[in-house]
Amino acid sequence: MTRAAERGQGATGWGLRGALVAIALLSALNAAGTVFVLCQWRGLSAALRALEAQRGREQREDSALRAFLAELSRAPGRVPEPSQDPMSAARNKRSHNGEPASHIRAESQDMMMMMTYSMVPIRVMIDLCNSTQGICLTGPPGPPGPPGAGGLPGHNGSDGQPGLQGPKGEKGAIGKRGKMGLPGATGNPGEKGEKGDAGELGLPGNEGPPGQKGDKGDKGDVSNDVLLTGAKGDQGPPGPPGPPGPPGPPGSRRSKGPRPPNVFNSQCPGETCVIPNDDTLVGRADEKANERHSPQTESMITSIGNPAQVLKVRETFGTWMRESANKSDDRIWVTEHFSGIMVKEFKDLPALLNSSFTLLHLPHYFHGCGHAVYNNSLYYHKGGSNTIVRFEFGKETPQTLKLENALYFDRKYLFANSKTYFNIAVDEKGIWIIYASSVDGSSILVAQLDERTFSVTQHINTTYPKSKAGNAFIARGILYVTDTKDTRVTFAFDLLGGKQINANFDFRMSQSVLAMLSYNMRDQHLYSWEDGHLMLYPVQFLSAASSQR
């Protein structure tokens, strides 16, 4: 028990000691704060006394200055005004509003001026000047200062009373179009207008389904008409060789001629060493010689010269033509686009360059860029049909000719580059029509025309596919076909001989759209329409090249 009591008294003593230590720390902090506040108060009191002393000095200076200035303001009333001499009066004219007050000078007044330097508030000086009615200790006026910056614009004034109406002015320019107003009421229907011109002929529609089989008709009467002989057909293939004929009678005895050198001897090479039992080799040699120098072979084109541009127009497709038969006729005809009904007729080449023309109206719409002019007549394809029209200038009634088994619709063109189904060509041998067969849909055919009867004399199948052709022309009875890019002549066909001829030469360098290509025998030039450029190409024949050698 005694030990427990001692332990309790020891714990109580330690608690009292901790409390006393905390109270001592708080007292020390309080004393330190009090000392700090007293120091700050003393500093602030000293600063306040200094400010009050400075303010007292300023007030005393202000009161002294006010008393001095008041004394100065009362001094001019007691001093008599001295008489002014003319020079003094002239010097004192400094105001336009009146004569200014005389200046106080030390020489004429029994006064002593004392100048002191002190700091005077600006507000005090302003109040002094206002109270003395303009009498200030200022010097003479200085020069006028620069003009100040422009002020802000003032407020708009109120509208004035409307004036009298003036005279009517001149009519002004037409103003801008105003906003569209509300739609008006529906008016009464107008009178029926005149019937317009017919539009361009469209392409034929697709073939319809076959109709139902009709009833059997009545038996017809027996005809006594004599059937006319049809046109001459194509030449058939050569037949097989026939049997040898009987031996002929012996010939008359002749003197033996000289033996040709190097013939049938041991030194001759190749097939010439074989001794023939007939004249086969001799005949073949003669045929080759005749073919090499035949007039038709010499009519071939060897080359095409550099082109010359005649005119540039806007239309990509078109045709320009000159008379082929009559050399004295200088007229030029132009059709624009690959479909239309109007033809421009120019008097001559200068009229073409100056765009001076006469407009001709055709009886039927044309289609394509394969027209031709021959003996004062225009030959062209009637759009939407397999008909060729011959329109003689100066007459109203045209002539027509139908070509059976020819493609003329569904954009199955003969030449896709020029959108042409039929190409009419005129050369030294007559009038030709180049077209595509509808039987196989690919071969190029040529029909020869009889100008007098305007009928077909023969059809020639070249067997050349139109898919490989870009354009074509006929010169001296030979058909020439270009490639699909119209840069080279890759095929030739002898229309009179009915056989293909080897031909492969350059035509042009450009790859523009070749809408029209035609040979004119009048000047032996190729006429072309290339993307709006009207061009001329000189032609070189084999006969001319041989004569130059």
Swiss-Prot record:
The record's keywords, sorted A to Z, are: Cell membrane, Cell projection, Collagen, Developmental protein, Differentiation, Extracellular matrix, Glycoprotein, Membrane, Neurogenesis, Repeat, Secreted, Signal-anchor, Transmembrane, Transmembrane helix
How the protein is affected by changing R91A? Abolishes furin-mediated cleavage and shedding of ectodomain
Which residue spans belong to the Extracellular compartment?
39-549
Its tissue distribution reads: Detected in sciatic nerve (at protein level). Widely expressed with higher expression in testis and skeletal muscle.
SUPFAM superfamilies associated with the record: NHL repeat (SSF101898)
- SMART domains assigned to the protein according to its UniProt record, in alphabetical order: OLF (SM00284)
Annotated protein name in UniProt:
Gliomedin
The gene behind this protein is Gldn
